[in-house]
Regions:
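SAM-dependent nucleic-acid methyltransferase catalytic core
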Residues: 23-127, 132-136
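Short glycine-centered segments of the SAM/dcSAM-binding site in methyltransferase folds
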Residues: 48, 203-204
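Class I S-adenosyl-L-methionine
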Residues: 228, 234-254
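Conserved phosphoryl-transfer catalytic core
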Residues: 1-36, 147-171
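Acceptor-substrate binding/catalytic loop of class I
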Residues: 13-21, 177-186, 208-209, 213-223
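SAM-dependent methyltransferase catalytic-core segment centered on the flexible catalytic loop
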Residues: 131-194
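Helix-to-beta-strand junctions that scaffold the AdoMet/dcAdoMet cofactor pocket
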Residues: 199-201
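Short alpha-helix
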Residues: 190-194, 220-233
């Protein structure tokens, strides 16, 4: 990284949602580093540095995440180069301190309702599904997703995104639920079934999920998800409720 000699990029991103939150100098630095990282042949090193770069670019931007809103603050920020070098050093330090053993890992984009996994092959699951009636995080992280090459439409096409009416009586739920809630829990039920299928006996799963708010009511997504899981065959061991987020630990029964 220290041997890279800066060259002003000939082309910069032109999307309005990007140009309005970055100075020209920050964008030039980002594109320069991105182009250099893309040239790295080692995939792990390339991904490692690209992750550090995207995180650093956001810190050097004028964006400020405030809950479900992205605000713009054009007060002076240190140059991207400073953030990037600090981030890479911090990530290297974390790797050294973690003392992780080399294991095979696989990262994939798929569908939680149709897992590409064999039956009873998983020991543990940790997941945070999309929250009911909450899609603003696709907007909050739109810049990061764009920089990493992921279209936000792929995210929105997942759990609870369909608009056609569905029946939920067969999974034991009230048909008077709002349409988006019915679609959401129908999908969640499918995801839980798949989770049950791939989990080994006595496997454990932790699900972080938040409640859903509608104009006429609040829906306890944690309670409903726990009920769906128990009907499928899981055993609810623990439920905790810090603010509006619940963690369910469920155990597959013998």
């Amino acid at each position: 990284m220290t041997t890279w000699k800066f060259e002003r990029p000939k082309q910069l991103p032109r999307e309005k949602y990007i140009t309005k939150v970055f100075s020209r100098y920050t964008l030039e630095d980002f594109v320069f580093y991105r182009n250099k990282i893309i040239e790295i042949e080692d995939e792990k090193a390339r991904d490692f540095l690209m992750l550090a770069l995207v995180d650093s670019a956001i810190k050097a931007s004028w964006t400020m995440k405030d809950g479900a809103v992205v605000k713009i603050d054009k007060r002076g920020k240190p140059p991207l180069k400073k953030f990037f070098k600090y981030k890479v050093k911090r990530m290297f330090k974390d790797l050294r301190n973690a003392n992780m053993k080399p294991v095979e890992t696989v990262a994939d984009i798929g569908n939680a309702r149709e897992l590409n996994l064999e039956n009873e092959t998983i020991d543990a699951v940790i997941t945070s599904p999309p929250y009911l009636n909450k899609i603003e995080y696709t907007k909050i992280y739109s810049i990061e997703m764009s920089f990493l090459g992921f279209p936000d439409t792929r995210i929105k096409s997942h759990i609870g995104s369909r608009v056609e009416d569905v029946s939920v009586s067969e999974i034991g739920l009230d048909e008077n639920l709002p349409l988006s809630a019915k679609v959401y829990f129908k999908d969640m039920n499918s995801a839980l079934k798949e989770m049950y299928r791939v989990c080994k006996n006595n496997a454990k799963a932790a699900i972080v999920i938040g409640g859903g708010c509608f104009p006429d009511r609040a829906i306890e997504s944690d309670r409903i998800t726990a009920e769906l899981a128990e009907r499928i065959g899981f055993k609810t061991e623990e439920t905790s409720l810090p603010l509006f987020t619940v963690t369910l630990t469920i155990r597959k029964e013998s």
